[in-house]
Amino acid sequence: MKRVYAREDLCIGCRLCEIHCLVQHSRSKRIISAMMCEQDRVTPRVKVEQSGQVTFALQCRHCDEPRCLEACPTGAIYRDPATGAILHDADRCVGCWMCIMTCPAGAIQRGREGHVASKCDLCQGQDVPACVHNCPNEALVFEER
């Protein structure tokens, strides 16, 4: 299965991955509208972290044995049988945050709405996730390892 991998040595912390993720998951799919006009602004599913001088993008690892999936009491976190990606069904999420507490990567967060979790979905339906496609330094790669 292809996954997104961060290359910390190439990340400059520009946060374009966050912006393009937000736009990809917005209603309008337009940067200005998504960032400034939409009332129900979505949460970027990737976040840039910094540790000392090192910056890197953090997103769901789509684990082979996902703790979040095992911990979810409603089945809102599930594995897509076709792609193997670990996905989230917001309609089934009750906001118990078990997925957030059990994720070893810290890659699941509360959505802006506050009552459901938010995580990377690998931009389902796209050949390459928006964060990878728009990274100016190729600090994010989408590949099988």
What annotation goes with each model-predicted range?
Residues 1-145:
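Non-ligating segments of multi-cofactor redox enzymes
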